[in-house]
């Protein structure tokens, strides 16, 4: 047997059903689209949420809220994530991005107090939660708001 003689196993492949190719095929004339109407036409489809002309739900409900264009989004780092650094190390936003703890700086870094810190560190970030601040200082480390 050679490569060009290989064939799939009998019955493992089903031939594609070609519609609209004569009435004797069983799928000629209307090609499985029924009779006339929007869905029988080319490009004829109804958008999602269409309710047959009735005012759709998304238009019956009131608009609500807005997006504040001045909102700052901080990259969040928990205390237990800082344990990867050596004792006495200086942790800056640049170092956090390089080590892969944070993907991007965004509007700055905020240190949160989740988890337990086991090392003395000097942490520089834009914001600190009160619990994170207390935990870093309790371990003999220092914080610096940048």
UniProtKB/Swiss-Prot annotation:
Coiled coil: none annotated. The keyword ATP-binding does not apply. GO terms for cellular component: cytosolic large ribosomal subunit. Pfam families: Ribosomal_L27A (PF00828). InterPro entries: Ribosomal_uL15, Ribosomal_uL15/eL18, Ribosomal_uL15/eL18_sf, Ribosomal_uL15_bac-type, Ribosomal_uL15_CS. Keywords: Ribonucleoprotein, Ribosomal protein, RNA-binding, rRNA-binding. Residues 1-57 are annotated as: Disordered. The keyword Ribonucleoprotein applies. Belongs to the universal ribosomal protein uL15 family. PANTHER family: 50S RIBOSOMAL PROTEIN L15, LARGE RIBOSOMAL SUBUNIT PROTEIN UL15M. This is Large ribosomal subunit protein uL15. The lineage of its organism: Bacteria, Bacillati, Bacillota, Bacilli, Lactobacillales.
